[in-house]
Amino acid sequence: MKFFTALRRPHPRTILPLLAVLLLGGIGSFALDIQPFPREVLRTEKLHEWTFASGVAGFMAQHECALSATGSVLRIQSRGKDPYLASGSVNLAGPFMVQLRMKSATGGKGQFFWTTTTEPHTDEARSQHFNLIHDGQWHDYSVRLDARGTVTRLRLDPGSAPGLVEVEKMALVHEHLHPLELQSVHTVGRQISLTLTNHAETALACRVEDRALTLPAHTAQQVTFTAAGKAPFAAHTVQVLAGNLPPLRRTVFVADAGATGDWVMLRSPEATVRVARDGSGARLEIGGQLVGFVAPLVWRNGKLPQLKLVSEAGDLHFAGDGINLTLAQRGAELAVAIQGDGACEGPVLRALGALEQGLFAGVEYLGKNERSSSTLDIETEEHIRYAPDPLKVTMPLMAFSTDRALTALTWTNMTLQPIFATPDFLDGAEGHRAALRGRHIAATLLVRKPAPLEDAILWAVQQRGLPPVPPAPRSREAQMALSLKALMGPPLRTAEGWGHCAEAHWPRHPFADCASTIWRLTGEAPQLPHLAANGGHIRNESLYFVTGRAQQWLQERTAEVRGIIAGQKPDGSFHYTGKYQRGHFEDTASGYCAMHAIRLLDFARATGDRAALATGLKALDYMKRFRTPRGAQIWECALHTPDILASAHLVHAYVRGFELTGDRAYLDGARRWAITGVPFVYQWSCQPVMLYATTPVLGATNWRAPNWIGLPVQWCGYDYAYALAMLAPHDKTLDWHKLAEGILITAEQMQYPDGEFAGCVPDSFSLAEQQRNPWNINPCAIVSLRLVLEGQLDSLAVAAADGHRVVAPYPVTVRAGKAHIAAKAGVSYQVLIDGARIVPVTSRGNDELDLNAAP
């Protein structure tokens, strides 16, 4: 992942009014940092307006665009991936809203920047992203700018692709907000507590339910009351009245665990479901203990439908108010089918108990007692993600592991709007909330005894199966030729060597990974004055051994490992002290430790080094304490941030531990961490290139932008796929080879097929626009992954038997004290024996070395 300015992200405040309609609730008092609903707007006041009947109204093209005005419309001709234009001088106090009418036929997101009298330069921190619709039709947009101070100029970035954008009008509007704000609502049983804030300069008299109170200026007050009624489940609308001001209303949901109900029972050995005969909700029980609710089973517009139980012979069937609802229990699963004549929400799962882990696939991966929509990984308003664009959801799964149960929700129609909040800050009820919105909903709930989150992931995949692998974009021969083309010439290769990326500002070095890949593809070793380690995302060090540099390799790897050992703590951990520790509850993480463990164990595998093996295994044993894959991309993302690269490192490390020791506990660890990576992989598609794309992290670079949720970074995925290829021979829990192959094919689909960057892999890929985004990475790693999945050698071969260990650049086996190497007649190469002795070989094709012979 590399930062690139062409990204455009939406401003969440532009979608919150819609979400307020879609969702039916308030905000928990225990989560005051999350306010999903904006203050109500009383009226608007226009501050400034641009029209284009007489020209471009002072706007200036600044980068990769040209401006003209025709027929009272501003025409913006984008000529690249980063067009932007600036307004003339303005002198207005913020904050305010930009209202504009636009049509676009380009791609990407829109973004506004602003400058002020005290901050005269543009900066990502003083900007706001928003979604653009690129269908060539007129659309109205409202974008709130949280500008502080006096704004002097605006900059508009109208997307990130070439094409035409037109603006009919643009205005700056001040919003006059309701002085009162319902900041939170929380229910415990029938008791409702709300926090009411007065933002006005004077005290305000108001009434909440049957209570009259006066709120002093700029203060908040908590009001608690008991909802009337005795039913187990009810929707209650809280109303706040204040003189002539419009009333504030918020619908909350009451789930009363102590209430006596008229129940219809669904039973299995795994769970009992007590369903209210009026269809309002259900209790979930295991062994007589309440572990959660499905409450409501369905509702819309803040109201429970009047349902009638029309059949209870086997499955339960309810009908009424234009809704048909069916419940069917099969063991630990509860199937729910909802058919509505309009949009509704259901089933609403409310898992009870202390959170051990939570998952919203592609959006949230939570640890013990963590909150969803937190600012630990994203500090802009995009952290509010309880109802994301469904395109960001990688697979249909929301799950909670608590001290009472493992509960999960999966569905079939990926156009449904999933809702996820823990704790439930949306409609105020207890527990952890997962639900779906739409007209026709088919969902399955899982209710099991307490179990790890990985069990829910595995269950969801097994419900649907892994999807078919996408078709390859080209033949194998053409694929390898395309990758080779990128490596053989400019812009990636210069006289100094290769860049990790093709852009000119990436330093060029004689990278071993690049040179080794060329040798694998052509059989010819590039002539280089020296070798530099790395260069790709997957190490390929063959060239050291075919150019007489095995001793250099051994010295460099030994020094690397000795440095890692020196940095390991006595308990086996590795601690991080950089700026990206901010917000994390400790100074270590699973991915950060695993990246060091890999180096130790790979070296132990190649050389038999006892210190590397001992410290590597100590790291594996320490990492058993971790449950969330995170902290592997601390060059730009928080140590806390959930991360598929962490899953990749952990699988790699634990597979090596198992191979070196035969201890199946390490294989169990590899399997567990492999499962944690699955929710980062897209297992559905509505675009030509999408299936098996991989979300890299569930957070943002520098906590701000880019936000990587829903923005695939396939190189992180193919690192994970490479680790799965290592695991596949040892474990059949899932078809790891198929999963890895799907990720590889999608990476190859994303490769540039032609043009300046032909053969390079884009750093990220925008799904909606089907757009490749820089930087443009060398293809060494996907060559390695393809070779490995085909059962071929991609880098150095290691074989161990009969008390010996051999490293060679060709396939090698050890039998009866001899190394058997399948090389190529006439080539010269080196072999490392037992981590110490380097033997030169001139190949006869099938070479045999006596490992017990005197040096």
Cite the ranges covered by each PLM segment.
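Extracellular carbohydrate-recognition regions
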Residues: 32-64, 264-267, 473-478
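Glycan-recognition and catalytic cores of secretory/periplasmic carbohydrate-active enzymes
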Residues: 453-826, 835
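Extracellular ligand-binding interfaces
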Residues: 73-150, 161-166, 173-176
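Short, solvent-exposed loop/linker segments at the N-terminal edge
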Residues: 184-189
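Extracellular glycan-recognition surfaces and repeat-rich motifs
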Residues: 53-72, 303-308
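Short proline/glycine-enriched turn/loop motifs at strand-loop junctions of beta-rich domains
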Residues: 104-108, 148-149, 198-203, 823-828
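Carbohydrate-recognition beta-sandwich/jelly-roll modules
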Residues: 76, 113-129, 134, 173, ...
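Bacterial N-terminal signal peptides
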Residues: 17-26
